[in-house]
């Protein structure tokens, strides 16, 4: 009996590509304040694995959860949604 496991995916913007085979992705989410009801934007920076160093700053990517690859890295970049515009 094999079970299918749902893989968590998030979408975010690459804010750093200075590390080898790793990018930092800023993931924003909107939550409602429990007391006042105002919609607040919260952000989280996640390190994700980029095997070929192909993603750059400003790219919008989809990351998916995987096994731990290092102390701080347990996500892998799965697809490119939008390439950053070059100036």
Swiss-Prot record:
Transcription regulation found in the keyword field: no
Keyword annotations: Ribonucleoprotein, Ribosomal protein, RNA-binding, rRNA-binding
InterPro entries, per the entry: NA-bd_OB-fold (IPR012340), Ribosomal_uS17 (IPR000266), Ribosomal_uS17_bact/chlr (IPR019984), Ribosomal_uS17_CS (IPR019979)
Function: One of the primary rRNA binding proteins, it binds specifically to the 5'-end of 16S ribosomal RNA.
Family: Belongs to the universal ribosomal protein uS17 family.
Quaternary structure and partners: Part of the 30S ribosomal subunit.
Name the record gives this protein: Small ribosomal subunit protein uS17
Species this chain originates from: Neisseria meningitidis serogroup B (strain ATCC BAA-335 / MC58)
Lineage of source species: Bacteria, Pseudomonadati, Pseudomonadota, Betaproteobacteria, Neisseriales
